[in-house]
Amino acid sequence: MQNGSVLSEVLAQPGATDSVFDVLAASVRSFSQGDRVGILGFAGGGVIAPLRALGGGHRLSGVDLDHAGYELFCDLSAGWMGAVQFAQSDAVEWLHSQRGKFDLLLEDLSVGRNGDVFKPDVSIDTLPRLIQSKLKPSGVTVFNLLPGDDRTWAEMTAKICAPFGFGVQVLFESYYNRVLVLGNEALPPAREVSRLLRAELTAIGSEMAADISVRSLRLGKR
């Protein structure tokens, strides 16, 4: 953890992390209508243990500039990780190169500086429109939003949401992170999203079931 934000967590077996990763996994499980999921910012694959515990059999493709986290993940998770592909690459270059469209893209990039962790500029200025172009019509993206270096929450949220017509945000009592769930087609109301996520989190015994609140995002419908 840095600056109140969890960067990665690797478990030796499927199960809850009792952290933001459980909510990311529950979001993938709840909103991916197919099984093709991309992870931008793989790190140690922290989302995969709770996702597999939830019964999510998605085909996962991850990208990260650093290979070390993936190696650790494989050492601990080879017996149960399921279909996982990894590329050591720049996230924008990798996503540009991908053929076909994704059911869900999870954006989990971060950059560390002086002991703190921030959202990189590319996550706010470049990736939202690229991600939108790489999603199926019914596809959804999940952004793990961290504090900005020199941007407000409102500015970051507005820029990330701009290409999308529908969305909700998940807030935490215990973490600075905010999770944005965005799509081109209508999502359930915030109250229903809260119920869906809490049900998934409760199913794996995650403490996050009592830690989250879900709010609507007012977006310009496309």
Regions of interest found by a model, annotated:
Residues 1-2, 22:
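S-adenosyl-L-methionine
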Residues 4-8, 110-116, 141:
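A short, flexible beta-alpha/helix-coil linker loop
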Residues 5-14, 28-30, 177-222:
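SAM/dcSAM-binding transferase cores
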Residues 15-137, 149-157, 175:
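The AdoMet/dcAdoMet-binding core of the Class I SAM-like
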Residues 57-59, 81-83, 138, 164-165, ...:
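A generic structural signal for alpha->beta connector loops
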Residues 138-145:
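Conserved beta-strand signature within the Rossmann-like core of class I S-adenosyl-L-methionine
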Residues 142, 164-175:
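Conserved S-adenosyl-L-methionine
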